[in-house]
A protein has these predicted regions:
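Structural marker of alpha-solenoid helical repeat scaffolds
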Residues: 246-248, 282, 316, 361, ...
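Single-residue signature of alpha-solenoid repeat helices
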Residues: 236, 272, 306, 351, ...
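Canonical tetratricopeptide repeat
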Residues: 258, 292, 337, 409, ...
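Start-of-helix register in tetratricopeptide repeats
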Residues: 218, 254, 288, 326, ...
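Residue-level recognition of tetratricopeptide repeat
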Residues: 225, 261, 295, 340, ...
Length: 625
């Protein structure tokens, strides 16, 4: 209001107007200064807010950093405590050595390192399927030399925690001069240890002896396995005996496995089997015990017992129930067991499939067995092309055991392909190789080789030699009894043949082979109904075994029931599609049942496949293609 009045008066009076103008200029200047001050205050406030925000951020970051450091420190301490509590390794302390040796560079740390090298070598040379976790005192590959620290350090803290919470094995020792040379002692923990003495130049030998003493003290089962592998069976047996008295339950069960291996080396398969049954009584889920039992029974040609042990091994392996098996070996072992089961029941196509899977896995002493199994299985499938392809794919080997295995399986394949002269040539080279095995030779000759050599001789009409060989075979050998029956059948000695087959089936009632052979004998005799009855039983036990189906079809055809025989031949073809005789007889059945065009297809297929000389003559009679 006052400003308005002054401005109104200024209009009437020039002097007043001049004063008013001066007043307005002063007010404008004041307002401009106030505006500038307010702008500066605003800028200062914004800068202050930025500083406060940055300060808050830095405060939070600092607090987070502190928290992170605390968490990391706690985690590190926790990890150190956990590692210490689970430490089962070996720590080798620097040895006490004479000053003159140290002056030459053989310090306590150098000697400790030499001992470490020897222990690592012993471990590497010990081949066992046993899992490290099953040892009461396992240090595996965790072996290290302790280098002393000065002052307080993280290393000292870790050592303190491991000593307080862990289960590590500490090895100490000393070397000193004697009148005759040197004396070396190495001890694990508080255990006493022998002292080894020798000449000045025998230090490496003395350290090796000390390392073995430590290995025996800390890893007795592994050391026994090492000894067995280095032709020191008597020393190994002593350790196994000590484990049976003082060892853990796992050690006792595995000690019996070690004793089984020693029994086999002496050729005592029955004794080895008894050791394995003792192992199983202690540890019923010990997979390797059942697998070794199956192998022992197989070597003895105890088909029924082998089948039972193999089934039990598969059940344990598939359930993962054996913590004692080295985990890396388990997948291969399960496949091997399944291949064995398939073979025991006549499912040779499945056996080859399992072998192929094994061949795709890392070699755990498993590839050669798979290769050899393929050869035999291809032969039993009457598939000459499969045998040849498998044989050509074999990698070269100079190992005598590999030579025996491959030659024996080629002999078996040629036997089923009816290549009698080739089988005899292969078979004649096997006995000298087997005899080189030492005490085991007698078992393999009388139970695995003589029966097949006898059957080959019979098919070459050398019955005198056939009987001389087969008479050397034992009465509890199932394949021996079966081949006795087949040799007698070839001479039309029907009652004697039936006697042997009856005994074979009684010893192995769950496998299909005895009744298959029995049915074949009855087919040769012309008793078709009885043959069909035996072959039906064989098929029930081995539903994927082609031989009883093919013979069943032949029996029906010879009974003038070609209409029924067709189904048997078709089913047999599912399991042995490259069997020349099968396609020949299938074609004959089609021809007799009024299907000449279909018969020609089977005859043409037979002509492409392996046929015996007799079957090839028969093919020419029925087909002129």
């Amino acid at each position: 209001m006052a400003m308005s009045m002054a401005l109104g008066a200024a209009v009437q009076n020039e002097r007043i107007a001049a004063k008013a103008e001066a007043f307005l200029e002063e007010q404008t200047a004041v307002l401009r200064l106030q505006k500038e001050q307010m702008q500066e205050e605003s800028d200062l406030h914004r800068w202050s807010l930025r500083i406060r925000h940055f300060s808050d951020v830095m405060k939070v970051a600092f607090e987070l950093s502190v928290a992170f450091i605390v968490v990391a420190l706690a985690a590190g301490i926790g990890a150190a405590i956990w590692n210490a509590a689970h430490d089962k390794g070996v720590v080798i302390e620097a040895f006490s050595v004479p000053p003159d040796m140290a002056a030459k560079g053989l310090t306590g740390e150098v000697v400790a390192t030499k001992l470490l090298d020897r222990l690592a070598a012993l471990q590497a040379q010990t081949v066992s399927n046993r899992a490290a976790s099953s040892y009461a005192n396992n240090w595996g590959n965790d072996i290290k030399v302790q280098i002393p620290d000065t002052g307080v350090s993280i290393g000292e803290l870790n050592r303190y925690l491991r000593g307080w919470l862990g289960h590590e094995t500490r090895i100490s020792g000393e070397i000193y001069h004697t009148d005759s040379g040197l004396s070396v002692t190495a001890r694990a923990g508080s255990d006493t240890s022998p002292t080894f003495q020798g000449k000045e130049g025998e230090l490496d030998k003395l350290i090796q002896q000390a390392a073995e003493a430590v290995y025996r003290s800390t890893q007795p089962y592994r050391y026994a396995v090492y000894l067995d592998g280095h032709n020191r069976a008597a020393e190994a047996k002593t350790i196994y005996g000590q484990l049976l008295v003082n060892g853990s339950r796992e050690d006792r069960a595995w000690a019996y496995i070690g004793l089984d291996n020693q029994s086999l080396a002496r050729g005592d398969f029955a004794g080895g089997t008894a050791e394995l049954r003792r192992s199983i009584a202690i540890e019923p889920n010990l997979l390797l015990a059942y697998e070794n039992l199956a192998n022992n029974e197989g070597a003895m040609q105890h088909d029924e017992q082998q089948l039972a042990a193999t089934k039990q091994a598969i059940a344990i392996g598939e359930s993962g129930g054996d913590a004692g098996m080295e985990p890396a070996n388990l997948p291969v072992r399960v496949l091997q067991d399944k291949a064995q089961l398939a073979s025991s029941l006549g499912d040779f196509g499945a056996e080859i499939d399992f072998d192929r899977k094994i061949e795709q896995l890392p070699d755990r002493n498993s590839l050669e067995n798979a290769y050899e199994g393929d050869i035999g299985a291809c032969g039993v499938l009457h598939d000459a092309g499969c045998v040849q392809a498998t044989r050509e794919a074999l990698p070269p080997s100079s190992d005598s055991l590999v030579t025996i295995g491959r030659t024996a399986n080629l002999e078996l394949a040629d036997l089923f392909l009816e290549h009698w002269q080739a089988a005899r040539d292969e078979g004649s080279s096997i006995p000298p190789l087997i005899r080189s095995l030492g005490p085991q030779a007698d078992v393999f000759l009388r139970r695995s080789e003589y029966p097949f050599l006898a059957f080959i001789a019979a098919n070459l009409s050398d019955f005198k030699n056939a009987h001389a060989l087969i008479d050397k075979t034992p009465a509890d050998c199932v394949v021996c009894l079966r081949l006795r029956g087949r040799i007698d059948a070839m001479q039309h000695r029907w009652p004697a043949s039936e006697y042997w087959f009856r005994r074979a089936v009684a010893l192995a009632p769950s496998v299909p082979f005895g009744e298959t052979d029995w049915g074949q004998m009855l087919l040769m005799k012309g008793d078709f109904d009885a043959a069909i009855e035996k072959l039906t039983r064989a098929h029930a036990k081995g539903p994927h075994f082609a031989d009883p189906l093919e013979m069943w079809g032949e029996a029906l055809m010879r009974k003038n029931r070609s209409d029924l025989a067709l189904a048997e031949f078709a089913e047999a073809n599912r399991y042995a599609p490259n069997w020349g005789r099968l396609h020949l007889k299938w074609g004959e059945t089609l021809l007799y049942s009024g299907h000449p065009d279909e018969a020609k297809k089977q005859f043409a297929r037979a002509a492409q496949l392996e046929l015996s000389a007799k079957d090839r003559v028969e093919l020419k009679k029925v087909w002129t293609g």
